[in-house]
Amino acid sequence: NDCPYSLANHWKNAAHLIGDTEKATKVEQALRAHRPEDAFQGAELEMLKYAYKLTIKPGDMQQQDVQNLRDFGLDDGQILEVNQIVGYFNYVNRLLNGLGVTTSGDTIGFYK
């Protein structure tokens, strides 16, 4: 959701945790191009679609968006967890952007 600070830190950590440079590059390219289907499928892809819509067009969310997650095997607890994580990051990213926080002088990522 267009937060350079969060993207820099969290992507570096995610790439490390993926543990495969080629796969990490494929995932990053797919996400930056807004084409998660190029790197994900099934429930993971459906969660990413849900996250994207909740981030970009929250007013357009419908019960069908939740049902789509159920159709891919997520239970209500898992759906709530996805919802809370997306909502939290949207909130925090808006705080960071609103305060003008940058990575200048920071060590990017947790892992060495």
Label every PLM stretch briefly:
Residues N1-K112:
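Hydrophobic alpha-helical segments
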